[in-house]
Amino acid sequence: MAEKKFTVLDLLDLDLPGHDALELKCIAGRRGLPRTITVPDINRPGLAISGFFDAFAFQRVQLFGRGETAYLKKLHDENKTDTLQQLFNYKIPCCIFSSSREPTEDFSRLAEEACCPILSTPLDTTD
């Protein structure tokens, strides 16, 4: 019997009423919800969004906290989306924004184009 793959949609389905520990919601990239999560770890992509991809753990769920979100805003304000385009050239399972933070318009647009799900949670990165 084939082993069932765990997808981003499965991650969202874990948040059923009464089991809503992560309080996740999909805010962009819905077409990518069938993407498989093959590595059960997270990655903080600070180095990647600054342009360093040599050791980028793209197979992991990418977790964006306060620092990463502030840097995304700086990239947006300076109209620099090259590194974001590079980020989405990798087949990332999904990105999660903590503390109800939201990605920039550029980030959301590129995620949509790459079919990369963007999830949001009100929880802090340390929760």
Give the predicted meaning of each segment.
Residues 65-67, 99-100, 122:
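Fold-independent oxyanion-binding glycine-rich loops
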Residues 90, 105, 120-122:
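Internal alpha/beta core interface subdomains
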Residues 88-93, 112-116:
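Short, surface-exposed connector motifs at secondary-structure boundaries
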Residues 102-109:
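Short, glycine/polar-rich helix-capping loops at beta-to-alpha or helix-loop-helix junctions
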Residues 114-127:
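Long, charge-dense
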Residues 2-88:
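Gly/Thr-rich phosphate-binding loop signature of adenosyl cofactor/nucleotide-binding cores
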Residues 93-99:
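Short internal beta-strands
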